[in-house]
A protein has these predicted regions:
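Structural beta-strand/beta-sheet cores of well-ordered domains, especially the beta-sheet scaffolds
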Residues: 4-6, 13, 47-50, 78-80, ...
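Generic enzyme active-site microenvironment
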Residues: 17, 51, 83
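Short loop/turn elements that form and flank the Walker-type P-loop nucleotide-binding site
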Residues: 10-13, 18, 43-45, 75-78, ...
Length: 169
């Protein structure tokens, strides 16, 4: 359950990017201590990039589980970029409304899902500074936008912390 730290430079702005293991529901008891170091990294971070596998059928529950965990460790108010990955693997099977069951309560196209998340985020009382991003790391869809948003957020945080260096970036 190790984290990986790399120096990243976007448009001449250097920062450290820490990749942690994903949040795991019902973590085996023996791994709880190892996972605490990952949570320490999250608490120390200036910006969180929450990457969600949009092709996973329970992605909304996974988002909720991460939200609960962040609240438990006191990191719920950290600036966060919500990134839905694997848009290339998201599948939509057209179904008749009569065929939908409580288990398939939402049978949405990717555009419908995107619109739904945009509405949820904008209506939230502590709405994030940037809307959710929809990308595919495999096909590079949305990667330039992700880079740009990360740069903007890191630059904003850097300018707040070091206003005398603002001219550098």
């Amino acid at each position: 359950l190790d984290t990986t730290v790399r120096k990243v430079v976007i448009d001449n702005l250097p920062f450290l990017l820490t990749d942690t293991v994903g949040f795991i529901r019902k973590l085996p008891h023996g791994l709880v201590e190892s996972f605490k170091s990952t949570l320490d990294e999250v608490v120390e971070a200036d910006l969180l990039i929450h990457v969600v596998d949009i092709s996973h059928p329970d992605h909304e529950e996974q988002i909720a589980a991460v939200g609960r965990t962040l609240a438990e460790i006191g990191a719920a108010d950290k600036p966060t970029i919500l990134v839905f990955n694997k848009v290339d693997a998201y599948s939509y099977i057209e179904k008749e409304p009569d065929d939908l069951t409580p288990m398939t309560r939402a049978n949405w196209t990717l555009d419908m899902l995107r619109d739904s998340w945009m509405a949820k985020i904008s209506a939230a009382p502590n709405a994030p500074l940037v809307p959710p991003l929809f990308i595919s790391a495999a096909t590079r869809t949305g990667i330039d936008t992700l880079r740009s948003v990360i740069y903007g957020e890191v630059r904003r945080i850097h300018a707040l912390r070091y206003p005398y260096n603002n001219f550098l970036y």
